[in-house]
Amino acid sequence: MGTCDIVTEANISSGPESNTTGITAFSMPSWQLALWATAYLALVLVAVTGNAIVIWIILAHRRMRTVTNYFIVNLALADLCMAAFNAAFNFVYASHNIWYFGRAFCYFQNLFPITAMFVSIYSMTAIAADRYMAIVHPFQPRLSAPSTKAVIAGIWLVALALASPQCFYSTVTMDQGATKCVVAWPEDSGGKTLLLYHLVVIALIYFLPLAVMFVAYSVIGLTLWRRAVPGHQAHGANLRHLQAMKKFVKTMVLVVLTFAICWLPYHLYFILGSFQEDIYCHKFIQQVYLALFWLAMSSTMYNPIIYCCLNHRFRSGFRLAFRCCPWVTPTKEDKLELTPTTSLSTRVNRCHTKETLFMAGDTAPSEATSGEAGRPQDGSGLWFGYGLLAPTKTHVEI
């Protein structure tokens, strides 16, 4: 980047940096800084609190410890770390254009938050793949507990490998009396190393996983939409089942679209900057970056909200987590939702419904592997738990 670069020298969240530095005189009024600080503080509080509660709901309740939910824990942990270690510190650096946090933390900021971002996206992709196998190929063997842990470990290792170049070339420099945390890329003609790394990273952390999730969820949606009980009209329980399937597809589309919308402007910002560096010389670019970075970081706080709004078990978990608040009153139903049940009739009687609901995600990963060979095992406590009672009839829990 050129000397007008205001926020990309430590581009802590996704990427590519320049091998030049420059002091920037950009500043903003105190009232404007206070507004941005309030917006970022609210983001961090919501994201950290929401994702911490999601992790607690799953790990503290045996009924929620399923294969898919372990991926959700991984996703929540990554989002929590990204909000706590990336959003706040990068906001301070972007708003002041001075690095206050030392050399060691400069290395850390160019490794761990980027790793967390990669883990977040890859965890979403793993969830999509798990849902694809559970719904499109329900009789294929499912992931065991050791396999799930191996996949999660693999995600972290790949993420660390992708983030390591930025950490390796990170350094702290002095630029006209101002301390900068920069990524000093090797000298090359025309900045090809920077551009190549930038394009590869964006492809791997955005376009590729987004394409995989789009294909997976499209096939899942088509499979659910076409799957119907033969010989019966859509009324009563069948109609409710059809409505549940539609809600399931809409939820998946919402998750993918939220991710895509939050991150697309941010990536376009850096793609444009790679080809037209003079855009960073405009005074308004500081406000543009702060807005785009807030939008990208806000993706870390939406998932807990989606879980709470669209899944009754997570909603019960959130009520239990906030039971100390005077306006939140958990019920016995909330506790029962997170307590393992021993019979299907108990669930049906408690819900006072004639519908037959089944959720194979009630078993933990270790228990799921001990079932019959070829038996469909669904590890979902979130995605409207799906399973088969018979080869000709499907059930979706809402």
From Swiss-Prot:
GO cellular component term of the entry, any: plasma membrane
Residue spans, topological domain Extracellular: 1-32, 91-107, 171-196, 273-290
Compartmental location: Cell membrane
Disulfide linkage: C106-C181
GO molecular function terms attached to this record: substance K receptor activity; tachykinin receptor activity
Glycosylation site list: N11, N19
Assigned keywords, A-Z: Cell membrane, Disulfide bond, G-protein coupled receptor, Glycoprotein, Lipoprotein, Membrane, Palmitate, Receptor, Transducer, Transmembrane, Transmembrane helix
Lipid-linked residues (S-palmitoyl cysteine): C324
PROSITE patterns in UniProt: G_PROTEIN_RECEP_F1_1 (PS00237), G_PROTEIN_RECEP_F1_2 (PS50262)
Pfam families, A to Z: 7tm_1
Cytoplasmic membrane side: 57-69, 130-149, 219-251, 311-398
Segments traversing the membrane: 33-56, 70-90, 108-129, 150-170, 197-218, 252-272, 291-310
Record's keyword annotation contains Cell membrane: yes
Lipid bilayer topology: Multi-pass membrane protein
InterPro entries: GPCR_Rhodpsn (IPR000276), GPCR_Rhodpsn_7TM (IPR017452), Neurokn_rcpt (IPR001681), NK2_rcpt (IPR000913)
SUPFAM superfamilies from the UniProt entry: Family A G protein-coupled receptor-like
Alphabetical list of PANTHER family matching this protein: G-PROTEIN COUPLED RECEPTOR TKR-1-RELATED, SUBSTANCE-K RECEPTOR
Protein family membership: Belongs to the G-protein coupled receptor 1 family.
Function: This is a receptor for the tachykinin neuropeptide substance K (neurokinin A). It is associated with G proteins that activate a phosphatidylinositol-calcium second messenger system. The rank order of affinity of this receptor to tachykinins is: substance K > neuromedin-K > substance P.
Protein name in UniProt: Substance-K receptor
Organism: Homo sapiens (Human)
Lineage per the UniProt record: Eukaryota, Metazoa, Chordata, Craniata, Vertebrata
Encoding gene (name): TACR2
